[in-house]
Amino acid sequence: MESDYNDIVAEYYDFEADSFERRAGENHVLKTLRNDFREFTLSRRPKKMLEIGYGPGLDMTWFADRNDIEIVHGVDISPEFQRIVENKARQRGDGKILPNLGSAEDIVEIVGESAVDTVYVYFGGLNTVNDLESVASAISKVLKPGGSAILTFVNRWYLFEIFWNILLLRPRRAFSRLRPVWNGYSPTRSLPSYCPTAREIGHKFGQFLNPVYRKGYCILHPAWYRKHWAPFNSVRSRSLYLMDRILQRTPLWNFGEYSLYIFESTDKE
């Protein structure tokens, strides 16, 4: 069953692989969020890193370009993404990026215990895992004592999406993330996923790691797939980002498109 699901996810991303990097570079909302994710990651002073769900290697190469980063391991379920990043690794020739093929559940076998000081997952790579609790345990094992995990998730409760689709008389789409299986963003291609709540994430990861920080994104600012509603650097975009920052201090922080969580490894006996 686990293998069948992993095959479905791998096939989905293999199809997307060739155009993934171009589309990511063209989307100003994705770029803004990615820059913020990276800044939070750098604030943890990483040296030996692991990315789960590395895609075309945008972040692996970005971190590897920094002199203070020693090595960036990666684990991704897509053979096409691995091929793309292996080509980038060969072109670099410095041995700093190591793309591996596998699932999030495989990371202990791939990189070993206490192998890295930082694990990061951007743009909801853990929304497509079989068992989030087992992944939380695996992340805690690969981290060195005092290491950090910077994790982002597609939110379960995205209030704007719910209200907008209700107004458009699309109740099925309005509540699609609340179902046991969410089919992803594409209206034509299904990616079976699960959107956990902040409480679920805190409970499952809190068994193995200490929570340090959390932040929500695109609470009022349009999500990446509605980037045209707030053009780059427009007054509307800047104003909505400001309002999102204000809402971070309220219970609405977790009702946007994405949330980021930082967890820290405890000392291991």
Please tell me what each predicted stretch does.
Residues 184-200:
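Acceptor-substrate binding/catalytic loop of class I
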Residues 118-131:
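A short SAM/SAH-binding and catalytic strip from SAM-dependent methyltransferases
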Residues 133-145:
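A short glycine-rich, Lys/Arg-flanked "PGG" loop and its adjoining helix->strand segment in the class I
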Residues 199, 203, 213-269:
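A C-terminal cap/extension of S-adenosyl-L-methionine-dependent methyltransferases
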Residues 1-44, 58-62, 150-177:
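Conserved class I S-adenosyl-L-methionine
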Residues 109-119:
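A short acidic, Gly/Pro-enriched loop at the edge of an enzyme's catalytic core
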Residues 58-106:
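Class I SAM-dependent methyltransferase SAM/SAH-binding core
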